[in-house]
Amino acid sequence: MTDKFDANDETRTVYAVVYDNDQPVSTGQFLAETKIEARLTRIVTLADYCGCGYGAKVTEALETYTRREGFYQLTIHSELTAQTFYENLGYQTYGSKYLEDGEYCQSLVKTILKWEKNMDIAMLIAIVGGLLGCYLYLTKNN
């Protein structure tokens, strides 16, 4: 797996790694693209561990990080052999297939809902609305 690193790895990358005892068997990377968009990349599982659900666990861990950090959308640039895997995790294809490093690829996207933040905002609006209603009622009736 050490051949899966590049210049971005020192400063902009967050990793998820699944271990079997002391051996890393699946990994993936998170890269922030903008303040609201990020990309998952280099999600890989060793051949002997494929089909065990480790790739899904890595992806879900990175999605949790994405949500917690306030990002709205995730993209993945996937080889065609992994497209169905990502579709099963809720990703949707966009754009045309393209050739990259000798492999045909497809871009996929997933909206990451920020329930916690939306709920906090909704609660704040309800509280402010309630206080404003009480204020208006009291000033009108006094």
Curated annotation (Swiss-Prot):
Keywords: Acyltransferase, Transferase
InterPro entries the record matches: Acyl_CoA_acyltransferase, GNAT_dom
Source organism, top-level taxon: Bacteria
EC id: 2.3.1.-
Enzyme class: transferase
Domain N-acetyltransferase: 1-120
MF terms in GO: acyltransferase activity, transferring groups other than amino-acyl groups
Protein family membership: Belongs to the acetyltransferase family.
Protein name per Swiss-Prot or TrEMBL: Uncharacterized acetyltransferase spyM18_1563
Provenance organism: Streptococcus pyogenes serotype M18 (strain MGAS8232)
Lineage: Bacteria, Bacillati, Bacillota, Bacilli, Lactobacillales
